[in-house]
Amino acid sequence: MKDHIIMCKKIFAIFVFIGIIFSQSPDELYNAANISLEAGNIPEAEAGFNAALQADPTFAPAYLGLAQIAIRRGDLSKTQQSIKEAIDADPENQEFRDEFERLNELNTLMNKGIRSMKNGDMEDAFVSFRIANEKFPHYPESVFNMGLGYMRKKEYMEAVKNFHIAMEINPEHKNALAAIKNVAKNFFNSANQSYKRGDLESALSSYEKVLEVDKTFYQAYYQIGVIKSKIGNKDEAVQSYEKALEVNPQFYKGYFALGLAKSGLNDDEGAIAALQTAVDIHPGYDKAYGAMSDIYFRTKNYEKAKQVLNMSITVNPNYAKGYANMGMIFTEEQDWDQATSNLVMATTLNDRDVMSFFRLAGAYNEKGNCSEAKEAARKSTELKNRFGGGWFELGVAEWCDGKGNKTGALNAFEKARNDRAWRKMAEYEIDKVKNPQKYEN
């Protein structure tokens, strides 16, 4: 049914177009096409000139109009053919014959310029291309070839300037567009190398140069946002990410980064909206679910956090952070069975996760499983020796509520005490081990 409606609309549009053609004179159609051509709308102008010829196949000015379109497209053969047809339609018109002769001069200039460029005589080539451009400003190949010449001289910004001029003349110039994209990509790769070296200033400058070349290079906006975020300028990071998304609304990584930046600005509502868009575009994007869970956890909305975390480990059963965050939530809720289950998965999938080993040790201690707690705590201390939390949980596991190793417990608590964040708690536990009678009911 839908296809039938679309087909009917197309047929209706064709009849309307035919009606317009037959309701207008060739002069009217020609004048309208000229207006389109001056506005840079080449396809519409071409349709108008062809419509004038359908109305009157002997209407010579329309052939000249098609020649003007052909020269804008860089097609000299088609240009000559259209002028010949104009002459055939109006043999007495000297203007058409003069225009045909002028094309010979353009051919000569272009051939000379290309030959000079092949021979390495760039200055002579530029002279030929400049004269061609001055005499035939609507012919894009002269400035395009000047761009190629500047590329050879490694004057990339001058090259791009000429490629853009070629595209202003002919917005459909695929070679000019490809050349612009190629220059932008080279600058982008250079920027990436600076970024990897940690030279953020040079990287930022190069990414901005990418955008001078090609304002549609959304990855450059994104990388600028990454750098701005890294140096703590979240507001400008947000602006850069939003520019990237204006160019490519399907760029889900951009929405993810935007969500993180907005979260850093305490715009939780905006952050969740951006992250939700990321998973709407890419339902398997586990990291976006994980980032949403961070926000819900921080705002103590544990049920929503569980929902998005369940989604994260559904789309990626090997997503360690999903289990780690789930373990954090169940720890807060003191559901030790669920906490240990999820934290075991987290540490199995990521055996470098210090905090999950620490939390797992704490959960085992709460369950009274001292041997498993010791194993998890030791792993935490091996990964991060100066973190007092791991030593603290090891001390609790060693003491095992008075049933364990007093010396081992004291040694662990002493090491926990070296971490200022854990000093008071460690000193309290040391006193409990040394003076248990003080803490008897």
Language model segments and positions:
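Helix-start (N-cap) detector for alpha-helical repeat units in TPR-like alpha-solenoids
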Residues: 26-27, 60-61, 94, 106, ...
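Structural marker of alpha-solenoid helical repeat scaffolds
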Residues: 55, 89, 135, 169, ...
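Structural signature of tandem alpha-helical TPR/SEL1-like repeats
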Residues: 40-47, 73-85, 109, 119-127, ...
